[in-house]
């Protein structure tokens, strides 16, 4: 089945009002495919501002994190309601940097995912293995474990987009080949079919998220199970438009 091409831009802890305006202006004026969904995720302090700038119909805004409570004494956290209140439609959850630096385990990621979905946000769910896990040959075991935690909590995957991000490729300049990514994505889709049914598996978009850039994005275009990209550093640069247009 045809799944809508999806490109997420994770700005991480980068950007100023000036640089974010430049990024959004580029997207607003660029010639983008009609059948693409683009989600840009600036730091939380700039969410409201970013939403106010976007005019391109293919582009929406998402958060980089949220919490499992609607409100309360949780200093420094962002709530789903607050993200929605400023116009965010999506949130990235389970990113390897959250798992590594902030010790978010599979259970926490699953709880956050369920809460965000229940409150009406779409979720870009990140999964992936470290270099050590890759060398040990346990990539599939790792991503299946990460998926199992969410499958236990979430039954309706309509608003979930999976981002496979090999941790060894993030921000390193290394990238899985398109063939390698296709193999892993196909295995992920097969696992979803086993656990959630073929229909859900066929409808769920699976993105590649390891150092995707303007130079390599085109090599993925004919890979049946690669439905787009979650882009890090390149989302801050003009080549982000090239990635969005890489299916043309």
UniProtKB/Swiss-Prot annotation:
Assembly: Homodimer.
Lineage, broadest ranks: Eukaryota, Fungi, Dikarya, Ascomycota, Saccharomycotina
Protein name, UniProt field: Triosephosphate isomerase
Database matches in HAMAP family: TIM_B (MF_00147_B)
Gene Ontology process terms (BP): canonical glycolysis; gluconeogenesis; glyceraldehyde-3-phosphate biosynthetic process; glycerol catabolic process
A Pfam family of this chain: TIM
GO molecular function terms noted in the UniProt entry: triose-phosphate isomerase activity
Organism annotation: Candida glabrata (strain ATCC 2001 / BCRC 20586 / JCM 3761 / NBRC 0622 / NRRL Y-65 / CBS 138)
Entry-linked NCBIfam families: tim
Enzyme Commission code: 5.3.1.1
């Amino acid at each position: 089945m045809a799944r809508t091409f999806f490109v997420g831009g994770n700005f991480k802890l980068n950007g100023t009002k000036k640089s974010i305006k430049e990024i959004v202006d580029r997207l607003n004026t660029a010639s983008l495919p009609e059948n693409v969904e683009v989600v840009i995720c600036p730091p939380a302090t700039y969410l409201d501002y970013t939403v106010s700038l976007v005019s391109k119909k293919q582009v929406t805004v998402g958060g980089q994190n949220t919490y499992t409570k609607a409100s309360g004494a949780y200093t420094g956290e962002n709530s789903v309601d607050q993200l929605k209140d400023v116009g965010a439609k999506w949130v990235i959850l389970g990113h390897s940097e959250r798992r590594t630096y902030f010790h978010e385990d599979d259970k926490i990621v699953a709880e956050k995912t369920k809460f965000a979905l229940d409150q009406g946000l779409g979720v870009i769910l990140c999964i992936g293995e470290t270099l050590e896990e890759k060398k040990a040959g346990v990539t599939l075991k790792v991503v299946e474990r990460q998926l199992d935690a969410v499958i236990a909590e979430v039954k309706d995957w309509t608003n979930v987009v999976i981002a496979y991000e090999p941790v060894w490729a993030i921000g390193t300049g290394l990238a899985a080949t398109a063939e390698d990514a296709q193999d892993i994505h196909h295995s992920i889709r097969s696992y979803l079919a086993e656990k959630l049914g073929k229909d859900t598996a066929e409808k769920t978009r699976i993105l590649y998220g390891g150092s995707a850039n303007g130079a390599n994005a085109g090599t993925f275009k004919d890979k049946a199970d690669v439905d787009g990209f979650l882009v890090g550093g390149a989302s801050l640069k003009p080549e982000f438009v090239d990635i969005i247009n890489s299916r043309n």
